[in-house]
Each structure stands twice: as C-alpha cells, then as structure tokens.
Amino acid sequence: MLEKIQILLQYLLPKYWITYLVGLGASWKGGWITRYAILLFIHIYKIDMKESDKPNLTDYATFNAFFTRKLHKNARPIDTNPSTLIIPADGIITQIGKINQTNIFRVKNAPYHLDGLLAGHDNIIDYFINGSFVIIYIPPQNCHRIYMPCTGTLREVLYIPGNLFSVHPKITKNMPNIFSRNERVICLFETDFGYMAQILIGAIIVGSIETTWLGTITPPREGIVRHWRYSSNNTNTDADDSIILQKGHEMGLFKLGSTVINLFGDKKVILNNLLQPYDIARIGMPLAHGHSQKK
C-alpha cells in the first residue's frame, strides 16, 4: 500500500516547483541558520566530515556548497591498474550486468531499452548493443561529484529534457522507465576500451546538473534537446580544444543526490563479478577490467 502511495505522489507532486524552491533554499546564504541546518543534516545522516577537503562548517556559506563538497585527496584511493575501470561515484549499486541486445533490465515486466535511455540516437545505441551497464544511486548524504572510470576523449554530449521523478531505489524498482523519462545528460567518451557512456539522471529536488567543461547544463529547463558534438580528430568542433578527461578525475556533479549510469560496449569490459545490486559503491574501487582497443 505504501509503495502505491509513493508512486501516486510521483504523479501528483508539483516536482518542478518543489525542485525550484529547494534550489533557491540550497543557494541561500543563511549564516548561522545554514550552518545549523548543515550540522543537523550531518547528524541525521552520520556524515564523516574527515573525508571532506573542508571539514570546517564555516567553509560552507550555502547548502549547495556543502552538498557539492569535495572529498579529501586521500579519502578515495584510485585503483592504478591501467586495465581497471573504477567506480565513478559514491552511492549504492542498484543494477549491474549485461545488456541483452538493447534490453538493459526489467521493472514490473517492462524492459528498459537502450532506445529510450539514449533518446533514440541510433549512432550511440549501436555502440552498446549486447554490452554491459551499471547504475549507481547517489543518496543525499554522499559526495555528489562524478568521476571518470577510465581516461576518455569526449565525443558527444546530449541534454534530454524530461520529468523529475524520484530515483530512490524504492521508486525505480516499482515504476517503469524512470531513467528514460527523467531529464538527463548523456556524455559519450571514446576510451582505450571502446566507447563509454556516462549518463547523469535528473530527479526531484536535484537543482542542477553540471559538467566540468560546460558548467551548468540544467537549469534552465527549456524543454528542448541540446546536442554538443566533438570531432574524432582531436579537434573539438564546439570549442577551441579537445577534451580528454583522465581516469579518476572529476567530470560533473549534482546539486543534491541522483543517479549515474555507465554503459560499455560488447566484449569491451568484464564487470567485477564481486559487485552485486545494493552493494555500497565507493569512488576508485574496481568496477571492471577492460580489453584495450589500441592496436
């Protein structure tokens, strides 16, 4: 009964207005009020501020500054094996496994298709048929910054407008196609292990999605698809320089928690068989072993 009520609320709640108002509040410089609210949040969620590069609360003028805090440089050791792809975010692995043709997994007997997740862009879909995937949910208390599983050269970025349903695991396991219906930013990288997609999923009260090269992508929420292309000859056609991001380097962030999805090509990587749904994910841990495509 509770699950049905939670799903019904996803349709009834004014999600855009809630997200807008929470975003305003999170950006407010409230002085001692903000610091007390942050302290209360830390207490409720038992956050270890020793992991932060700024453990002193006076360093955070707004809730957003706290939510997007950086980790201490030694907080998440990066697996340095060049064949190892690492987990890109702190959170919970909600799904991991193989892609069956274009079917990623099923929710309530309804399949998730690459076509829906990638908004029908066949040139991208083709890279991941029979590939593999991982979905990581980022709770509010975790680090909201997203990192690179391996070194990659940026090829395309797509902003897909959509809804702002909750991506909490209790909702996503009972409500079909949330990731294909929510707004999202799809980043396509060319790597030594074939193509990789890193997809940042929007959700209710996620005030912003940003990347390190474009800055804030959303808001504004104008309801239109935006597409950035980068050439394959190391000449960025939408900017002055090619964009190469190194393994373990930051690539984006959420202002409040959400979900990141990674897609890999067929026979390009072997997922870490020790990882299972609902395992804790930590940045830098081994995610997969890659087969280099270098000749």
Curated annotation (Swiss-Prot):
The keyword Lipid biosynthesis applies. Pathway: Phospholipid metabolism; phosphatidylethanolamine biosynthesis; phosphatidylethanolamine from CDP-diacylglycerol: step 2/2. Keywords: Cell membrane, Decarboxylase, Lipid biosynthesis, Lipid metabolism, Lyase, Membrane, Phospholipid biosynthesis, Phospholipid metabolism, Pyruvate, Zymogen. Is synthesized initially as an inactive proenzyme. Formation of the active enzyme involves a self-maturation process in which the active site pyruvoyl group is generated from an internal serine residue via an autocatalytic post-translational modification. Two non-identical subunits are generated from the proenzyme in this reaction, and the pyruvate is formed at the N-terminus of the alpha chain, which is derived from the carboxyl end of the proenzyme. The modification Pyruvic acid (Ser) is found at residue 258. The active site is at 90 (charge relay system), 258 (charge relay system), 258 (schiff-base intermediate with substrate). GO terms for molecular function: phosphatidylserine decarboxylase activity. Heterodimer of a large membrane-associated beta subunit and a small pyruvoyl-containing alpha subunit. This is Phosphatidylserine decarboxylase proenzyme. It comes from Blochmanniella pennsylvanica (strain BPEN).
